[in-house]
Amino acid sequence: MHTEHKTTADVILPESPACPLNVVLGGTPLLGRLTGIGRYTYELARALVASQIVDDLKLWGDLSFLDAGMLKRGDPTSEGPAGLADKKNRGRSGSLAVSARAFASRSYYASMVYQFVSGAMAERRLRPLADSHLYHSPNFIMPHFDGARVITIHDLSTIRFPQFHRKQMVVLCEGGIHSAIEGKVHVITDSFHVRDELVKDFGVEGSRISTVHLAPDPRCRPRHESECRHALDALGLSHKAFFLSVGTIEPRKNLLRVFEAFRAGRRASHFDWPLIVVGASGWKSSREHEMLDELIKDGLALYLDYVTDDTLLTLYASAGALVFPSLYEGFGLPALEAAACGCPVITSEHSAMAEFAPEQTLFVNPEDVSSISDALKAIPSRSEFGSGFDVSTQAAARTWVDVAQETSDVYRAALQG
């Protein structure tokens, strides 16, 4: 852990805040499947409400306010929250927002029209709340708001690797990031890695940035083989005898090198484990799918696309190792959740993941196929990995209430100006 950095615990706050804490949270990420930023938004909002950290929480969905009651309908013991992608959770406002965003995704110009309309709508609807509420944007884009503002910048991938993103996404995220950097917005980052990028490369004052590490899904835990057997049998898998890859199928996830390293290891008979790939198809992923299809055709891999939370947690707890040597991450939640489930992790050196990874983590050079291959070879042959990771680490024990509490500290600091 980077102990030389300050956390939200270092922010000086009044002992007894006199003002109520009222927050408008950007709810747009809740309109799709709850992966990445959608998951962050849901878990943060749910923890803020459930623990009564905020006095009032409103969800703004670009064109109108969303039904915050959907946060209370999720059952943390079930397969997981569906968000507003599930029609039964949407309500009229959510359905309108989903339809509008579908239109915006059609082209760059449709996206620009959508941003103009939603920006005007936000300015009009949010104006009355400027004196009573703080606005927190969880996804790079900050609407016009005259009150206190907080923005979470999860990563700088659209700036670091613009070639990996659609043009409209690059324009939107770059605009949001630069607006936050140039304005008087307090910034939250998921890692010190991104915080350092903002300070060193973009000249953002460190006093304006707070790092709040994420937490694993509250259902993450090691599971006995008997508990996983039904799901594993359905997939034809053996307990602790397969590699797992989790994340969107896109160039930034470095899957081409993973597939190359995996095939080389199988060809050399270093291991006989299959590779299980979980993740929705992303942009510019045709080559990744071609290589994956070749592995599947040869009986070496299985592609599961998007799976339920319950299935994913079972896979984490059952895998011999998570293979996650991403080229760039703002945090790397799959690595944390896998470790919290007792799964060994192979991930990138000098990355955000190094801030929370357990001692047994195997770090690799993500740009070196042989480095990845050596790590794949090491896992099945090392007995200490047979029973999984020791998950008794600070990061694995962290909860979303911890995240919400530290985030509320940032809110109060932002309100103090």
Segment roles from a protein language model:
Residues 1-417:
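Carbohydrate transferase catalytic cores enriched for Leloir-type hexosyltransferases
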